[in-house]
C-alpha cells in the first residue's frame, strides 16, 4: 500500500494548489497530531483546508478533523505567518520538497516580509519555517547530517530560489529524455554494474578465509532500482510503467543489461510518453486514479452465508500505471488529484480509527465479560457450599451411631490426658481393625476441638445392606494417599467436620445453619453483584467515552455552507428565505449585493434592529402575510425590544422603495437607508423565537422534494388561470401560463400594496442607531420657481448686509472673535456656492415645478438623545473633506466624480447562481424528513416559533438571562436524547461544532424552554 508522496505526486499537487490557493490568506494553523497539521486558507467566498503530514503527504481536504492541543511549533508558525497571503506554491527542483511562499512588501518580494514554509517528504520528513534570507525560524525536528551541516533554529537552509518550480516555464527547464541521454544513462548503469564477478567475487585474501566462513553474496541491483536512483523526477511507478511498456522486466538485473537497439528504441518511446505525463501534471486540473483490491470476507461461524466483499485502497497515481492495469486492479477516477489523494488518505485514516474504536470496544466487552464471570463464580461457590452443607447434614443423619461412636472415642482419649500426637498414632494403628478409627481422617483438628470423618455419601447409597457397608480397604487407600480433603465429595464417601462438643444431630443442625447462612449470603451477593455489574458497566462506558473523546483524529465529511449562512437566516413556513444582517456592515452588504426586485425590506423603529430581507421567488408575486409577520419577529428579536421585552410592531416596504441617497443627494453612512414610501406596519408580535434542526437531504431526496414543490406550483398556477378565465381574461395556448399568472399577481400586488406617492410625503432615514421616536424624518415639499428665486435673493441680501457689518478682511479685524467670524463666513460662502450649483444641476430644463428641496429642520437621534439640527448643516458637515479635494476640478469633473460615487452605492441585482443555491437549499433542507428520505447532515436554525410548526426537533426561545453557548449546547443534548443512540441523526448532531451551533442565534441573552407546556425544562441561567 502506498503511504507517501513521490516527486511526481508533489508536482501534481503543487500545480493544483497554485491554481486554487495562491492569493488566499492563511486564516489559521492547527495541530492534528505530532506530525500532522491543518492549514486553513480563505478569500472572498472561498475557503480551503490543506493537510500536511510530515514526510508523507500534503493536499487539500474536504473532511473536518478535530484539532489537537496547541504545540510550541504551531504557536511559532502562527506568530509569523498567520493572516499572511500565500504568494506561491512550488516544488524544489525534482526533489520531494514542497515550498509555500508567503510574500510581502513591494511586489510581494521583499525578503524582510517574506516567509517560506518548507515541507520535506523524504526519509522521516520535516517541516521548516524560513525567513526571507533562508534562516530557519522554527522546525519540527532537528536534523544532523554531519559536523558541518545541521538543520536547527538559527541555521541557514539550503534553498535555491531559482530552483523552485512555480509554473510550466520552470518545469520546462527540467531535461527531457532523449536518445543521447538514454545512451549515456544505460552506459553508466552498465559500467556501475558491469558483471557479477567484478562485484560479487571475493578477493584473494577473502578466498583464504572462505574455508572457515562463507562470504554472503549481495543481491544484484534490479534495472528498475538503477533507473530510479538516477531518474528521481519520474518516480518508481512511472519508471516501472516505462519498463513494462517497452516489454522489459523491472526486476531484470542491471548488470546483465545488453545494448539492444530495439529495446533502446522501445525504452526511449516509453520515456517520451513519461515526459508527456510529467508535462500534463503541471497543467491543472490533474486527473487522479485510485487502484483498489476487492477482498472477500467469509463468516467462519456460518460457512453457508454468502461472501461479503470489501474494497481496500492500494495505490494512487496521476496516471494509470501499466503494472496495476495488468494486475486487474479496480480503478476509480477523480476530476482533480487533490480529491483523489484526499479520498485515499482519509479512507485509510477512517479505517485506522475504525479499527482503534473496534479494539477499544472489544477491550471494554472483555472487561465486562470478566466482571460477569467473576460474579458468576462467586454465586456458584455459594451454591456449591449450600449443596455440600446439606449433603453433610444428610450424611450425619443417616449415620448417627457411627458419628456418636467417633465423638465418644476421641473424647475418651482426650479425657485420659493422652498426648495429641499419641492419639493420632493410636488411631493410625487401629485403622485396619476398628471401623470407627478407619472413618477418622488424620491429622486431627484438636486445636479447634473438631475432627474430620468420612461418611457414606447419601447420593451414592443404595437401599441394599451390601452397598451401605463400609469397605475397610477403600478407607485405608484413601487415608494413605491423602487424596480426600475436607469438603470434597467423592463417589462413595464425603468428608464431614464434626464438633467434639456436640452430638450427632447437633452437628447435623450446625450443617443446616451453615447452609442457611450460605443461602442468605448468596441472596445478598446476587443483589450486590447486580449493582457491581451495573457500576462496572457504567465505568467501562465512561472510560470508552473518555478515550473516544480524547481521540482527536475523528474524520468528518465537511458540509459546504450556503452563502446565506453568514447572515441571520431562516426559511419561513411558506418556504421563503428570510435574511438579516448581523451588524451595519452586513446590512450594507445585504442591501447592495443580495437583493432583487420584488424583495421585501423589513425593519423596526428600535435601536440595533437588523435589516431583514424577504427573498421573493417571483418579482411580481406578493409575499404571504405569515412570512412578513415572521420576518418582523426576527427584526424585533435582533433589536432592544428583546432585552426590554417590549411588544411593538415592525414595518415593511418594497426593496425598490429603499435607497442609499438622502434627499440632499448625499450618500448615507454604512448601515443607514432612506425609505421613500409609506411604512406598512405589521401587527404587534409576541417575542417567542425557536431553535431547531433542519435536516439536509441527499441529491435523490432533494430531487423528490423539488418535484413535489414544482407540482404544487403548477397546481397553484392552474388555479390562478381558472380565476382569470372566470374574470374574462383570455388565455390562449400560445401564452405562457406563468407569465400571465405573474402579471395578474403583479396587478393584484399593485392594487393591494401600491407604492405610496412620495410627493409631499416624508422620507425616513433608517439606521442602526434609532431612538424612541424611531427613524429620522426629513420632510420634503414642493417648492415653486418663484419661491426659489425669492429665497436666493433673500440669501444674497442677507449676505450683503452681513458683509457690510463685518470687517472687509482679516487684516482689518482686531479681536480674535471677529477673525473667527470672518473665517466662518468665508467657509459658509464656499459651501453655499457649491449647494447652489448642485440645486441648479438637479433642476430639469423642461419641468422646474416638480423639484423638491428639503426643509431646514431635521432630527438626529443617537443613543436616545435628540439634537435638532438643519439639513443644510448636515450637508455642510459631510462636504468638508470633499470640498478640499475638489478645488482643482472643473464642474464637469466634479459632476462625473459624484455620479461615479453614487453609482458605486446603487443596489446590484443578485446573480442567478445564488438564486439557484436558494432553491437548492429550500429543496434539500427539511424540518421533518420522510421515511424514504436520506439524511446526510444537520443544520441548526433560529427562527420565529410559529415558523417551526413542522420541525421534529425544536425548542422554544424566550427573553431571559441565559448564555447563548450553554443554552445551544443544552438544546443539542436535548435533541440527541430524543433520538436513538445508533441513529445517523444523533451522530450528525454530535458532530456539530460549537461555531455551527451558536452562529444562527441572533440574540445575546435568552431562556430555552424544552418539551411541551406540561413538561418544561428551562435552561440554567
UniProtKB/Swiss-Prot annotation:
Biological process according to GO: CAT tailing; rescue of stalled ribosome; ribosome-associated ubiquitin-dependent protein catabolic process
Compositionally skewed regions (Polar residues) per UniProt: 746-761, 839-856
Acidic residues bias: start-end ranges: 462-480
Positions of modified residues (Phosphoserine): 478
A GO CC annotation given for this chain: cytoplasm
UniProt record similarity statement: Belongs to the NEMF family.
Entry function: Key component of the ribosome quality control complex (RQC), a ribosome-associated complex that mediates the extraction of incompletely synthesized nascent chains from stalled ribosomes as well as their ubiquitin-mediated proteasomal degradation. Thereby, frees 60S subunit ribosomes from the stalled translation complex and prevents the accumulation of nascent polypeptide chains that are potentially toxic for the cell.
Subunit structure: Component of the ribosome quality control complex (RQC), composed of the E3 ubiquitin ligase rkr1/ltn1, rqc1 and mtr1/rqc2, as well as cdc48 and its ubiquitin-binding cofactors associated with the 60S ribosomal subunit. RQC2 binds to the 40S-binding surface of tRNAs.
The protein, known as: Ribosome quality control complex subunit 2
Species of the source: Schizosaccharomyces pombe (strain 972 / ATCC 24843)
Gene behind this protein: mtr1
Amino acid at each position: 500500500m502506498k503511504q507517501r508522496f513521490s516527486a511526481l505526486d508533489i508536482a501534481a499537487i503543487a500545480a493544483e494548489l497554485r491554481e486554487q490557493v495562491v492569493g488566499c490568506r492563511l486564516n489559521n494553523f492547527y495541530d492534528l497530531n505530532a506530525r500532522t497539521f491543518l492549514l486553513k486558507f480563505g478569500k472572498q467566498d472561498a475557503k480551503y483546508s490543506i493537510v500536511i503530514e510530515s514526510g508523507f503527504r500534503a493536499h487539500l481536504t474536504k473532511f473536518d478533523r478535530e484539532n489537537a492541543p496547541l504545540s510550541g511549533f504551531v504557536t511559532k508558525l502562527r506568530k509569523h505567518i498567520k493572516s499572511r497571503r500565500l504568494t506561491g506554491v512550488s516544488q524544489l527542483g525534482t526533489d520531494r520538497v514542497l515550498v509555500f511562499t508567503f510574500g510581502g512588501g513591494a511586489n510581494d518580494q521583499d525578503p524582510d516580509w517574506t516567509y517560506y514554509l518548507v515541507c520535506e517528504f523524504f526519509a522521516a520528513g520535516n517541516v521548516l519555517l524560513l525567513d526571507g534570507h533562508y534562516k530557519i525560524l522554527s522546525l519540527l525536528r532537528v536534523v544532523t547530517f554531519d559536523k558541518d551541516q545541521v538543520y536547527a533554529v538559527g541555521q541557514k537552509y539550503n534553498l535555491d530560489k531559482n530552483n523552485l518550480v512555480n509554473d510550466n516555464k520552470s518545469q520546462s527547464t527540467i531535461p527531457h529524455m532523449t536518445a543521447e541521454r538514454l545512451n549515456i544513462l544505460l552506459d553508466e548503469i552498465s559500467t556501475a554494474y558491469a558483471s557479477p564477478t567484478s562485484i560479487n567475487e571475493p578477493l584473494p585474501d577473502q578466498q583464504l578465509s572462505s574455508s572457515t566462513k562463507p562470504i554472503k553474496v549481495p543481491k544484484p541491483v534490479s534495472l528498475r532500482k538503477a533507473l530510479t536512483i538516477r531518474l528521481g523526477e519520474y518516480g518508481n511507478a512511472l519508471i516501472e510503467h516505462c519498463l513494462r511498456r517497452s516489454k522489459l522486466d523491472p526486476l531484470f538485473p542491471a548488470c546483465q543489461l545488453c545494448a539492444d537497439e530495439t529495446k533502446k528504441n522501445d525504452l526511449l518511446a516509453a520515456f517520451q510518453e513519461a515526459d508527456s505525463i510529467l508535462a500534463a501534471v503541471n497543467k491543472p486540473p490533474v486527473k487522479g486514479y485510485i487502484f483498489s483490491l476487492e477482498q472477500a470476507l467469509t463468516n467462519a461461524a456460518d460457512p453457508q452465508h454468502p461472501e461479503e466483499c470489501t474494497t481496500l485502497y492500494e495505490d494512487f497515481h496521476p496516471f494509470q500505471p501499466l503494472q496495476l492495469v495488468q494486475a486487474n486492479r479496480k480503478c476509480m477516477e477523480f476530476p482533480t488529484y487533490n480529491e483523489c489523494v484526499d479520498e485515499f488518505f482519509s479512507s485509510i485514516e477512517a479505517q485506522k480509527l475504525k479499527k482503534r474504536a473496534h479494539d477499544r470496544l472489544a477491550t471494554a466487552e472483555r472487561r465486562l465479560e470478566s466482571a460477569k464471570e467473576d460474579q458468576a463464580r462467586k454465586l456458584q461457590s455459594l451454591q456449591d457450599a449450600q449443596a455440600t452443607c446439606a449433603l453433610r447434614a444428610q450424611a450425619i443423619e443417616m449415620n448417627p451411631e457411627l458419628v456418636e461412636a467417633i465423638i465418644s472415642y476421641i473424647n475418651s482419649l482426650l479425657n485420659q490426658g493422652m498426648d495429641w500426637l499419641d492419639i493420632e498414632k493410636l488411631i493410625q494403628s487401629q485403622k485396619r481393625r476398628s471401623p470407627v478409627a478407619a472413618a477418622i481422617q488424620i491429622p486431627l483438628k484438636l486445636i479447634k476441638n473438631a475432627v474430620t470423618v468420612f461418611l457414606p455419601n447419601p447420593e451414592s447409597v443404595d437401599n441394599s445392606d451390601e452397598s451401605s457397608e463400609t469397605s475397610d480397604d477403600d478407607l485405608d487407600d484413601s487415608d494413605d494417599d491423602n487424596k480426600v480433603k475436607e469438603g470434597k465429595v467423592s463417589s462413595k464417601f464425603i468428608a464431614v467436620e464434626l464438633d467434639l462438643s456436640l452430638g450427632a444431630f447437633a452437628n447435623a443442625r450446625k450443617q443446616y445453619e451453615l447452609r442457611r447462612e450460605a443461602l442468605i449470603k448468596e441472596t445478598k451477593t446476587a443483589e450486590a453483584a447486580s449493582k457491581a455489574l451495573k457500576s462496572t458497566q457504567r465505568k467501562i462506558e465512561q472510560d470508552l467515552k473518555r478515550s473516544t473523546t480524547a481521540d482527536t483524529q475523528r474524520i468528518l465529511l465537511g458540509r459546504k455552507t450556503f452563502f446565506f449562512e453568514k447572515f441571520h437566516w431562516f426559511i419561513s413556513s411558506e418556504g421563503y428565505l428570510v435574511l438579516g444582517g448581523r451588524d451595519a456592515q452586513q446590512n450594507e452588504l445585504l442591501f447592495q449585493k443580495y437583493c432583487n426586485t420584488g424583495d421585501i425590506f423589513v425593519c423596526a423603529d428600535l435601536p440595533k434592529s437588523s435589516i431583514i430581507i424577504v427573498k421573493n421567488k417571483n418579482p411580481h408575486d406578493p409575499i404571504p402575510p405569515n412570512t412578513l409577520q415572521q420576518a418582523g419577529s426576527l427584526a424585533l428579536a435582533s433589536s432592544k425590544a428583546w432585552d426590554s421585552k417590549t411588544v411593538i410592531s415592525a414595518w415593511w416596504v418594497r426593496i425598490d422603495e429603499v435607497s442609499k441617497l438622502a434627499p440632499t443627494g448625499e450618500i448615507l453612512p454604512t448601515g443607514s437607508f432612506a425609505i421613500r414610501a409609506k411604512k406598512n406596519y405589521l401587527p404587534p408580535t409576541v417575542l417567542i423565537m425557536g431553535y431547531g434542526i433542519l435536516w439536509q437531504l441527499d441529491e435523490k431526496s432533494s430531487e423528490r422534494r423539488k418535484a413535489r414543490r414544482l407540482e404544487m406550483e403548477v397546481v397553484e398556477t392552474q388555479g390562478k388561470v381558472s380565476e382569470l378565465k372566470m374574470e374574462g381574461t383570455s388565455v390562449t395556448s400560445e401564452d405562457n401560463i406563468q407569465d400571465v399568472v405573474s402579471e395578474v399577481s403583479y396587478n393584484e400586488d399593485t392594487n393591494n400594496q401600491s407604492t405610496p406617492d412620495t410627493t409631499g410625503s416624508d422620507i425616513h432615514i433608517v439606521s442602526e442607531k434609532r431612538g424612541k421616536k424611531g427613524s429620522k424624518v426629513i420632510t420634503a415639499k414642493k417648492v415653486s420657481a418663484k419661491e426659489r428665486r425669492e429665497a436666493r435673493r433673500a440669501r444674497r441680501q442677507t449676505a450683503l448686509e452681513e458683509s457690510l457689518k463685518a470687517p472687509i478682511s482679516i487684516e482689518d479685524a482686531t479681536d480674535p472673535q471677529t477673525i473667527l467670524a470672518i473665517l466662518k463666513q468665508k467657509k459658509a460662502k464656499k459651501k453655499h456656492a457649491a449647494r447652489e450649483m448642485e440645486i441648479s444641476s438637479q433642476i430639469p430644463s423642461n419641468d422646474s415645478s416638480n423639484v423638491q428641496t428639503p426643509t431646514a429642520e431635521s432630527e438626529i437621534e443617537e443613543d436616545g438623545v435628540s439634537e435638532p439640527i438643519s439639513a443644510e448643516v448636515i450637508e455642510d458637515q459631510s462636504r468638508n473633506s470633499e470640498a478640499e479635494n475638489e478645488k482643482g476640478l472643473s464642474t464637469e469633473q466634479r459632476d462625473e466624480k459624484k455620479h461615479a460615487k453614487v453609482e458605486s452605492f446603487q443596489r446590484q441585482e443578485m446573480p442567478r447562481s445564488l438564486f439557484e443555491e436558494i432553491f437548492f437549499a429550500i429543496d434539500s433542507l427539511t424540518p421533518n424528513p420522510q421515511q424514504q428520505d436520506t439524511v446526510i447532515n444537520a443544520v441548526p436554525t433560529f427562527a420565529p416559533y410559529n415558523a417551526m410548526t413542522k420541525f421534529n426537533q425544536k425548542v422554544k426561545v424566550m427573553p431571559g438571562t441565559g448564555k447563548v453557548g450553554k443554552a445551544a449546547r443544552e438544546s443539542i443534548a436535548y435533541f440527541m436524547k430524543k433520538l436513538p443512540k445508533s441513529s445517523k441523526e444523533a451522530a450528525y448532531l454530535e458532530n456539530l461544532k460549537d461555531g455551527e451551533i451558536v452562529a444562527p442565534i441572533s440574540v445575546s441573552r435568552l431562556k430555552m424552554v424544552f418539551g411541551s407546556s406540561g413538561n418544561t425544562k428551562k435552561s440554567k441561567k
